[in-house]
Amino acid sequence: MKKISSLSKEYGFSVIEDASHAIGGRYQGKSIGCCQYSDITVFSFHPVKIITTAEGGLATTNDVSIADKMKSLRSHGITRDTSLMTSVSEGDWYYQQIDLGFNYRMTDVHAALGVSQMKQVDEFVRRRSDIAGIYDKEFKDAGLDVL
């Protein structure tokens, strides 16, 4: 990741880190998703992942402009921020569509399902690590090289 990050700075491209299977993981002592070497990190909450919300995912970034753009896109490109509007706000209830966007908002029920599992994420990661250790041992005893 460090080399990819260096190349991105040298050649001017962005890095999106796919951490779909890495919720709760660490790399070089830092939490995966901290965007140390990427502009955005994405996680999946599909049912086969460590944490599930039945569908959906999460994106993290340290870049405020990227975060603002993601917030806008997730909600049909709508804003209530008067500084971004092209005309004067008519009141607190007023909103404006300033960009094309999508409906990428998770339902409250799906979010609650995901949040309820967060207390157990360390245990889930530990259990997966234990299982991986068993596979490593069995493959080693079988004379197979694991890449």
Model-found features: residue ranges?
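Active-site core of PLP-dependent enzymes with the aminotransferase class I/II
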Residues: 1-14, 24-27
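Short, conserved loop/helix-junction motifs that constitute active-site signature segments
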Residues: 7, 34-36
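Glycine-centered flexible beta-alpha turn that most often forms the glycine-rich phosphate-binding loop
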Residues: 18
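Active-site region of PLP-dependent enzymes
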Residues: 21-29, 37-147
